């Protein structure tokens, strides 16, 4: 799944190459997506490359190759300059912060179990968009939760495996906007991408740290990261 900005950039590159045979410059991509700096374009290109949508050609300036497009892409819809995407894969639109869930509800007479809404998926790997629909509810032990509002997310990726969090697990999150160093959090980056990582501080910056040596720690300015909740529990199904 691509975020809206990733889709916008992919389609902009594709349409420009169809028109002129040459990929757009980083400045052109920045202006087309209305981003403040070229660093945002670098991040989007890296994400598209990691997902297999584009390839950077070595030893050539501005050399990008579009490998594939979103399945629902319609070539009859042409982008305009400045440009909104013709396709939103999965019809997500622009991702928003994780919606505030309803309080957990008791589902047993003795109050030992509660129902928690599953709000979608969260990346433990390359950041993806958190899906904003309450897809279904799950029942968890009441003593797993404590106080506060909670929601669940299904994990996609392997960047937190050394913390015991695996692809396909369901994590239970206590809703909140603050975290202490070392907490595993749902972090929203640039109001665009959601990811599950360990929260650290590096001076005035925020570090989102993976629990897998294959992934680098990502450093952001404090205004670029919003904490959406902290990990309080995990559910795993064995097949």
Curated annotation (Swiss-Prot):
The keyword Hydrolase applies. Belongs to the peptidase S24 family. GO terms for molecular function: DNA binding; serine-type endopeptidase activity. Homodimer. Gene3D superfamilies: Umud Fragment, subunit A, Winged helix-like DNA-binding domain superfamily/Winged helix DNA-binding domain. It comes from Rhizobium johnstonii (strain DSM 114642 / LMG 32736 / 3841). It catalyses: Hydrolysis of Ala-|-Gly bond in repressor LexA. The record marks 124-125 as: Cleavage. Residues 26-46 bind DNA. The keyword DNA damage applies. This is LexA repressor. It comes from the Bacteria.
């Amino acid at each position: 799944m691509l975020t809206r900005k990733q889709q916008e950039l992919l389609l902009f590159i594709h349409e420009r190459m169809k028109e002129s045979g040459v990929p757009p410059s980083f400045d052109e991509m920045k202006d087309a997506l209305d981003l403040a700096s070229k660093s945002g374009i670098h991040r989007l290109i890296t994400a598209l490359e990691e997902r297999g949508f584009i390839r950077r050609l070595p030893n050539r300036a501005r050399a990008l190759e579009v490998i594939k497009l979103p399945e629902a892409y319609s070539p009859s819809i042409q982008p305009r300059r400045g440009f909104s995407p013709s396709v939103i894969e999965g019809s997500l639109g622009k991702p928003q912060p994780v919606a505030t869930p309803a309080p957990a509800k008791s589902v047993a007479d003795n109050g030992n179990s509660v129902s928690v809404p599953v709000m979608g998926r969260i990346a433990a790997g390359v950041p993806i968009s958190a899906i904003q629909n309450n897809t279904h509810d799950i029942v968890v032990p009441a003593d797993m939760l404590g106080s506060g509002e909670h929601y669940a997310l299904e994990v996609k990726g392997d960047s937190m495996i050394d913390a015991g969090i695996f692809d396909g697990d369901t994590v239970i999150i206590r809703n909140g906007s603050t975290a202490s160093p070392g907490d595993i959090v749902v972090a929203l980056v640039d109001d665009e991408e959601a990811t599950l990582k360990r929260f650290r501080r590096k001076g005035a910056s925020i570090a989102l740290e993976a629990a897998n040596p294959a992934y680098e720690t990502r450093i952001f300015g404090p205004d670029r990261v919003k904490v959406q909740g902290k990990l309080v529990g995990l559910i795993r199904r064995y097949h």
